Amino acid sequence: MFVDQTKIDVQAGKGGDGAVAFRHEKYVPLGGPAGGDGGRGGSIILVADSGLRTLMDFRFRRKFKADNGENGRIKSQYGRGAKDVRLKVPMGTSVYDFNTGELLGDLVENGQELVVAHGGKGGRGNIHFATPTRTAPEIAENGEPGEFRTLRLELKVLADVGLVGFPSVGKSTLLSVVTKAKPKIAAYEFTTLTPNLGMVVLPDGRDFSMADLPGLIEGASKGVGLGIQFLRHVERTKVILHLVSMDPNNGRDAYEDYETIRKELAGYTKDLTTKKEIIVATQMDIPGSEEKFAEFKKKLGDKTVYPISSVTHKGVSELMGKTADLVEEVAKEEAEKPAEIKVAEKEYVYKKPEDEGFKVERTGEHSFVVTGNKLERLVQRTNLDHTDGIMLLARKLKRLGVDEALRENGAVTGDDVSIADFTFEFVD
């Protein structure tokens, strides 16, 4: 089954907690702190694989979680970092943040990687908190939480040339003639339900990839028929071959069909109408097709149209030669200008939430909630199992102005104050 879009949840691993430990060895009377750092949590990484053609692997499994880093140990031993989880996706996969719609990256090259959820950093052990006046600190950091993301994966077929047109205009037949692809061909509409991909190799050694896309109908850009779910595949093509049937028995107006498909392409995105296009008049072997072709060509005006028959192969070689010329022309133009798509680097780094200060909110007669990215991260990273850690947190909150802000909002000694999942008693 061809699956070209899906939604997945990715949860990176939490960093290991730093340890509070001390040396207890003979002949080392002063000992000292010896708590090691926690290991980094595992990240979730998407990897483009040229051997995949669909997002089928994500149809039934949509939640992925990396392991947490190990906690720090005694004798200054660091915790082991967790292994990253690498998920293979087809080349041509676009990755979006499901909640914001932001394009995180396009995986268009084999082996290209995109880090979609970073593992949390390991917390520091108490060996890092010793000072001349604090020689035995019972202070350590908790590991950072791993990032969680809900992603939308969208596959856009990577092909140099896309075949578009109404159903039953001969797209699959043409693909089967010029490539080794074996698409399903039958005398009824919507025979092609998924994109088919093939490689065209010309006698002069030039080659290009070609995709047969499911037939479009009026309203496709608004979701009618197979519609919008396949229009996205046209986006990555360099050249569009617009096939129009010259069968005089189908009861259709060829020029109206051509204009309708052009409107649907524009309705999806204006970019599609700026792509290089070759108009192809198909099924020219059918009696009466010449008259219909003459009328069609007249209505097109000065636009060039290539008449072909995939049955007799008449005109096909000339068409493929012209197509190869256009593919090379577009490739040269693209090489001379900056890439317009956002390509994922080897590692994509999410922006840390901006520190927008903090906000104090009274939630009851004697209760307050303090919110703010920086404060919440500070509380999450502080090991509150030891008195030294709690006192260090209290000093940091005071320096950041939290105590003063609570007083200004009417807090008095004994009131409850909550930051993230930590609640403490305010002391003025």
UniProtKB/Swiss-Prot annotation:
Cofactors required: Mg(2+)
GO CC terms of this entry: cytoplasm
Cited Gene3D superfamilies: GTP-binding protein OBG, C-terminal domain, GTP1/OBG domain, P-loop containing nucleotide triphosphate hydrolases
Domain Obg: residue ranges: 1-158
Annotated positions binding Mg(2+): S172, T192
One BP annotation, GO: ribosome biogenesis
Subunit structure: Monomer.
Name this protein carries in UniProt: GTPase Obg
The encoding gene: obg
